[in-house]
């Protein structure tokens, strides 16, 4: 509950557009292969209408995960049931879903609502029904209730989705997370906007607006700060901004390139690209003391650092082999190892949270696509089929990647599952959107 309280507090602090998504999500591939699940509308036990339909949030989350396909409510055998006590196992035998989510909402005081939900294993329930002995303790996978305010309905819907997803897959859900990105609208006097929003585009908040370019936002491991590059002072500078206090700290303002910041796993340092000593090289800056350490030293361009989960190595893009490829540098020894060989170029890489895979941009036959490589087998899989993909960022549970691409001549965000089955676009209403970054668990 402490984690949920922290997230809800941040959501209320930053919320500016709670009822409309700043980014639409258009699913383009993969829903047909998803696992069927039933999500019942939560029974409202008050007068008038509830503040928000929590079940709609849950259904949307499960669809966007690429893993589940909620069934049409009209085809469900029971209606208006809000608790496991009303569930009739025998009625659900021919539905074909593996699980059922149901719940209720009732007023619980001034701006307070008691939300209850149950997660039922329909396969176990049906097996018990056939045996003639139905016991909820055998098929009830989870049952919870929480008191929330009207402003917290959407966030608690994401929380329910996280629970359902983890119970059914064994993988932690990432619905209670946020994304950052840059919107560019050249019809405005200050066209560059640094934004954050819920992972699904709701609750968008503008952190900074500038007449000069903003780029490369990245989250701290605790989700409290954002580092980014700003040209607001007519040169590239790296800032770190606290999302709670809005305090901005300038971390790097050397002559030349100051770019591609990446927080260390402990949040104390930034890996960056600087050209202050000549060629672009990789450095690590202590955020508190501003102490700086040079990591690479080569005549070729070294850029786009990212951290391995253990904090002992960096992955980076380098042209030291003649064309952009991904390399690993051990921070203790300084030893550099080439990681990619397949395709013309490989760049913009990051390691998945479990340390087992690498996500990056692969160029083959002139097409830039998002790819995944298993670090054990070295097998590479191209995940996307578009042409100009860039800036991949991995969800904290490692199941999805958000990235920038071009659709109908316009820069948009898109998402793909790390197995390549599910794909979606996230177009913005006005302008173009790029440089996405997925937050850690919040």
From Swiss-Prot:
Signal peptide span: 1-21
GO cellular component, as recorded: periplasmic space
Record GO biological process: cell division; protein import
Keywords assigned: Cell cycle, Cell division, Periplasm, Signal
Subcellular location(s) per record: Periplasm
Disulfide cysteine pairs (residue numbers): none
Main location: periplasm
Superkingdom to which the source organism belongs: Bacteria
Function, in words: Part of the Tol-Pal system, which plays a role in outer membrane invagination during cell division and is important for maintaining outer membrane integrity.
HAMAP family per UniProt: TolB (MF_00671)
Oligomer and partners: The Tol-Pal system is composed of five core proteins: the inner membrane proteins TolA, TolQ and TolR, the periplasmic protein TolB and the outer membrane protein Pal. They form a network linking the inner and outer membranes and the peptidoglycan layer.
Family, as annotated: Belongs to the TolB family.
The protein's name in its UniProt record: Tol-Pal system protein TolB
Species lineage: Bacteria, Pseudomonadati, Pseudomonadota, Gammaproteobacteria, Alteromonadales
